[in-house]
Amino acid sequence: HDVVIMGGGIGLAPLRPAIYHVLNNRDRYKDFVLLYGARSPQELLYAQELQEWGGRFDMTVLVSVDVATRGWTGSVGVVTKLVGRGPYDADDALVFLCGPGIMMRYGAQSLIDQGVTTDRIYVSMERNMKCAVGFCGHCQFGPTFICKDGPVFRFDEVDKLIQVREV
């Protein structure tokens, strides 16, 4: 499969192990694309690693910031604008997203518009979990408890809930 990883802000942190998994098992995957966005260049996580990954021949790294500062020469705009700019086959891609809810919602929709099916898009519903056993209800997302049932879900399992604000 091709692999597309899309992170927004601190959402890159939980995706980092997946990035290293793909890099350490490159022979098991075809095209590998990382799409990452942050508010500003100063808020980019793992800047040194982003630079190293971007220099690799076996992956594509596309980075965007919402607001450019002096000296920034990269892309400006929301990370979802990067969808479609990397080499991957929408019919064969597995996609992993983590970031703010709105980014995941619009990111998934952009990927769907490119032909990726909802059962191949995985979202990491990182929530502030307290008890980790589903007792307190703090991480309840509709009928789902993120701590017990996730935090990673196929998009087709949560797409209706992710559309609702404040769920």
Segments (PLM) and residue ranges:
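Non-heme iron-sulfur electron-transfer modules
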Residues: G142-V167
